Design a protein with these regions (language model features):
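Classical protein tyrosine phosphatase
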Residues: 257
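Extended, charged/glycine-rich binding lobes that contact polyanionic ligands
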Residues: 1-246, 250, 260-270
Length: 270
């Protein structure tokens, strides 16, 4: 990971020591690293305890892989997969219900903040929500967009839509300014939104302005670049193989989504 340190203490950096972290490739820059600057991520991943036959077939499948569906990974939906449910409550202005769910899944200090505010302002659930970290609330509402994106993409692929065609490489990230696509894709988009019991205007949450979502687009299919795959003896599991993968993905694309095409990993609920 590339990081930036504002006005660094050079001596402290020189003496930095941690058993699992090393610092290298130092250089001065005029600006700090911010959201939006990232071009992509390079991954090196080891998957262990694989049967020899499976290791060969899986590695061959990975080498032949091309584009894959750009689904949001399960981590987007929270530790228990609960974020879209809470996000929908916020969009539907069910502020008390949303606050209860957030409090139940929050550390003690956040619960105390909520309880302290409500003790002084009974029934002001909206006010209590506004005192929570913006980033946390944004993640919750963004998860609704992500869930809808995944459902649209999955149904579109099931119905044989071709996302390699020019002008049809994206799926919507729904918001109050969304323009649905023409044809079958647009029908799917509107059907999925209706099935989630949501409208475009639900995303125009005036009560919490920083949660208003205009909408956007996201690539439907992406490619893993700089891909290398190696099968080797697994030194930790006698008699088994390990697969060592290296690949680069664009910003915002999940390594777990790529890997799920080849490996049966447990979900957070499991």
């Amino acid at each position: 990971q590339r990081i930036s340190i504002f006005r660094p203490d050079i001596e402290k950096i020189k003496s930095f020591s941690h058993p699992k972290i090393s610092l290298s490739n130092f250089k001065w820059e005029k600006r700090k690293i911010k959201i939006g600057y990232l071009e992509g991520n390079h991954f090196k991943i080891v998957v262990r305890d694989i049967d020899k036959k499976d290791a060969i077939s899986i590695s061959n499948k990975i080498r032949k892989s091309n584009f894959f569906p750009n689904y949001f990974g399960s981590q987007r939906f929270g530790r228990l997969g609960n974020n879209p449910k809470v996000g929908k409550m916020l969009l539907k202005k069910q502020f008390e219900k949303a606050l209860i769910e957030i409090a139940n899944d929050s550390p003690p200090r956040v619960k105390e903040r909520i309880e302290d505010y409500l003790s002084k302002n009974p029934k002001d659930f909206l006010g209590a929500l506004k005192r929570l970290p913006r980033k946390n609330l944004l993640i919750i509402v963004n998860s609704v967009q992500s869930k809808i994106f995944n459902e649209i993409l999955e149904r579109a692929l099931d119905e044989g839509l071709d996302f390699t065609k020019k002008g049809q490489e994206n799926c919507i990230l729904v918001g109050y300014k969304t323009n649905f696509y023409d044809g079958n894709l647009g029908i799917i988009e509107q059907d999925i939104l209706k099935e989630n019991d949501l409208t475009l205007q639900d995303f125009n949450l005036q009560e919490i302005p920083f949660l208003r979502m205009k909408g956007g687009y996201r690539k439907a299919l992406v490619e893993a670049k700089d891909l290398s795959v190696e099968v080797a003896e697994d030194e930790e599991f006698s008699g088994s193989k390990k697969i060592i993968l290296e690949f680069t993905l664009p910003s915002g694309v999940y390594a777990t989504t790529f890997l799920n095409n080849f490996f049966d990993f447990p979900t957070p609920e499991q």
